[in-house]
Amino acid sequence: CIRDRTNLQLQKDRENLLLSAGVDKNYLKPHYTCEICKDKGYTDGKICSCRTELLKKFASEELSYKTPLKLSSFEDFSLSYYPTEKYGNGISPRERMKGVYEFCREYAADFSTESPNLFMYGETGLGKTHLSLAIANEVIKKGFSVVYDSAQNLFTRLEKERFGREGGNTEDTVLYCDLLILDDLGAEFDTKYVLSEIYNIINSRISYGRPTVISSNAALDELTGLYGARVTSRIIGDYELILFEGRDVRQIKKRLSK
């Protein structure tokens, strides 16, 4: 009809004016971050994936912000604190930790939601927290949602929310974030609730295909006594086992600073 032809001509004239002024002809058209929902957050009456991802990112940032630890980097991890003397297995702690360092760095660089689960174990002060924080730092830079917290802080928060002493959706955030890093899983968590929650988190994230990194001071032969057969079976069967060896780096640094 005449009106349609007039509108088309007006649009063409406007585009020509913009082009003659050196401006892109699409300058006046809206530019959306999400072309699926046109930045409305919903499509076909359902929450758009962009909104879900944004909420997930905010939730993980808020939860990780509550940890008292600062993100570390691979650059400030030093192998010089690890002994060069060979142990009974014919490998020195420095050689082993060089391999651990390179593995963790590659893990972070190549991270995807299909990356394997990691169980870092060994005595206290050997760099488990440092390298897990370095992984978190790099994975966050790649745009993935990361939740990092100590086991004690996390299970305390989950318990308060579960029994109504605090509000929040920590459990959903923990279960569905791209990467969960659970630091310092120790022997002090021996209540039925905590043991049940440990299994729920580990098992659920395996089912959802979401990678998890756990660090612990416990030896492998102590796992069943600490966490039960179900948790131990999941860790042994579904996690890459990363042994940390050496002397307590924190104590060495403390002595050197005097």
Where are these regions (language model features)?
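Loop/turn-to-beta-strand initiation segments
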Residues: 116, 144-145, 176-179, 208-214
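Interdomain "pre-motor" coupling segment immediately N-terminal to P-loop NTPase/helicase cores
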Residues: 22-72
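Short glycine-rich substrate-engagement loop in P-loop NTPases that contacts/grips substrate
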Residues: 84-98, 139-176, 192
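Short, small-residue-biased leader/transition segments that mark boundaries at the very start
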Residues: 1-2
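Pre-Walker A (pre-P-loop) alpha-helix and adjacent loop at the N terminus of AAA/AAA+ ATPase modules
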Residues: 70-118
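Walker A/P-loop nucleotide-binding motif
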Residues: 114-131
